[in-house]
């Protein structure tokens, strides 16, 4: 899938229908998209439900892909990733991409709390604070050496298991 723009912010809404969410939660995504759009940002919008497409598909600088895209590729090429969940934000943060969680659930996971505390990820449900964050936060340089080392260790262990069969 070719996106209609090279520079973009990825937005994924909250899963407001999930059982782990607070009751009667109101999504911040409409306000967030309106503000980002008014500031001239290109937005890759990844809806959870078909009804999510109705409002955002009308904007010129909002692209809703017709089919699923590879999440890690999206994170890597995004200027920032804003999501109403945690996994997507964690993946982006690990790649050095400015990552925002506006999760509306009852409790943040310990891993999210740690990443927020360490400055890898930002948490807010205030669209103004989120926009301030992405306007000032730049991509972090990330060393992939440790990842490569772990990958090689796993491969070596798998080879040893296979050889002993």
Please tell me what each predicted stretch does.
Residues 22-23, 56-58, 93-96, 112-113:
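Short amphipathic alpha-helical segments
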Residues 29-37, 89, 112, 155, ...:
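Short amphipathic alpha-helical segments and helix-helix/interface helices
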């Amino acid at each position: 899938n070719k996106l209609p723009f090279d520079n973009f912010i990825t937005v994924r809404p909250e899963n407001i229908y999930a059982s782990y969410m607070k009751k009667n939660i109101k999504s911040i995504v409409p306000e967030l998209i309106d503000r980002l759009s008014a500031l001239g940002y290109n937005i890759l919008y990844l809806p959870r439900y078909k009804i999510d497409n109705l409002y955002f598909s009308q904007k010129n600088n909002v692209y809703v892909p017709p089919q699923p895209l590879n999440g890690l590729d999206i994170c890597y090429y995004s200027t920032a990733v804003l999501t109403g969940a945690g996994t997507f934000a964690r993946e982006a943060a690990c790649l050095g991409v400015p990552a925002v969680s506006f999760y509306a659930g009852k409790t943040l996971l310990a891993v999210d709390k740690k990443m927020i505390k360490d400055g890898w990820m930002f948490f807010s449900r205030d669209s103004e604070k989120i926009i301030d964050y992405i306007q000032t936060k730049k991509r972090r340089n990330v060393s992939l050496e440790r990842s490569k080392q772990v990958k090689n260790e796993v491969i070596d262990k798998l080879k040893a298991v296979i050889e002993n069969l």
